[in-house]
Amino acid sequence: MAYPNGKLSEEKVFKDPVHRYVHVRDKLIWDLIGTREFQRLRRIKQLGTTYLTFHGAEHSRFNHSLGVYEIVRRMVDDVFKGRPEWDDSERELCLAAALLHDLGHGPFSHSFEKVFHLDHEDFTRGIILGDTEVNQVLRKVSPGFPQDVAEVIAKTYKNKQVVSLISSQIDADRMDYLQRDAYYTGVSYGHFDMERILRVMRPREDQIVIKESGMHAVEDYIMSRYQMYWQVYFHPVTRSAEVILTKILHRAKQLHDEGYVFTHAPVHFYSIFEGKLTLEDYVKLDESIILYYFQAWEDEEDAILSDLCRRFINRQLFQYVEFNPNEEMSAYFELTSLFKEAGIDPSYYLVVDSSSDLPYDFYRPGEEEERLPIHLLTQNGQIKELSRQSAIVESISGKRRTDHKLYYPKDLICDGTKHPEAKMKIRQLLGLT
């Protein structure tokens, strides 16, 4: 089945700094964009706290979702259309899944999820299948269409070609966010020749492959991703802001659990704190609400909550030192004791933060997170795995890079008016003297 009155009478376009224009010709897509659940993504930043490091990084999940849709639209309408190994009947499914793939992200996304043990993918599925405006639109295609969209996003849909468009090691999701995040942060790392990659993509059996002639463009894409993760996504200042953000949320929950009477009651958090979060509660949360509470809590009587909120709102972040957990745990335990002696709560002010990334991996069947490799289509029709053909990709393939940092409030430990001896020892251990 198809969406009623499938095509718009006139094409709609969004001006876009990455793709120039996002074209909408399908009434299904236009109606999905207009739903309250999709419009909510305007109020969720794509890069969370990164705006405190790169001031231009104010773009939203809404921007990114439109960009992923546009890339997939070009794939199915321009690159794959009419090819014998591509099924045009699943076009609407591809477009809807691309548009809605990030629908369940919450405020400050991964930091928020980590604190409250949530998974945005569960909420994406809930919005698509639940009593929502998005579900009402999808059901106009067919009663089973919402389930198909949810399965594509969850990577369980039967047609793996469709899944790979938005979830693989070279997909529309990554191709959009690398370029978009590079544009808004102002860095040069995320640039690669997407036009070339799209031109050499080919549907084959249960996957999308790349013609071997496009291998160098794919190499640039892989290296762009590597650089963006370590120069932007894992930037130590961004991580400092995330540390403070998570500690604010931890502190607020602890105070609630202890019966603390807030001057500014966190009414939007009650269902989360009490483990009773509903889908309706969740879709009402966005970053403007979170920041409202952070600003209000600057005036709370609890000194820790007030201080952490002041730091986040005014960008007075923690400093850091490199940390090796395999060799320096004894120093960490000593620092913990000294922080307590100095009257500084180490559970909120002494934090080890770790970042890890695997830029590209070959297929490892049976592993917890199987990654389907990128395959090249050679001139004689053979299919070869990318790292077997590219020395550049082979050099980083399967190699996980991990980085650990120890975050602390330099201003507090350099204030010698109270507990000067303990603070002197802290500074010595941190290499500040």
UniProtKB/Swiss-Prot annotation:
<dbReference type="Pfam" id="PF19276">
    <property type="entry name" value="HD_assoc_2"/>
</dbReference>
<dbReference type="GO" id="GO:0008832">
    <property type="term" value="F:dGTPase activity"/>
</dbReference>
<dbReference type="GO" id="GO:0006203">
    <property type="term" value="P:dGTP catabolic process"/>
</dbReference>
<dbReference type="InterPro" id="IPR050135">
    <property type="entry name" value="dGTPase-like"/>
</dbReference>
<protein>
    <recommendedName>
        <fullName>Uncharacterized protein YwfO</fullName>
    </recommendedName>
</protein>
<dbReference type="InterPro" id="IPR045509">
    <property type="entry name" value="HD_assoc_2"/>
</dbReference>
<dbReference type="InterPro" id="IPR006674">
    <property type="entry name" value="HD_domain"/>
</dbReference>
<feature type="domain" description="HD">
    <location>
        <begin position="61"/>
        <end position="178"/>
    </location>
</feature>
<dbReference type="InterPro" id="IPR003607">
    <property type="entry name" value="HD/PDEase_dom"/>
</dbReference>
<dbReference type="Pfam" id="PF01966">
    <property type="entry name" value="HD"/>
</dbReference>
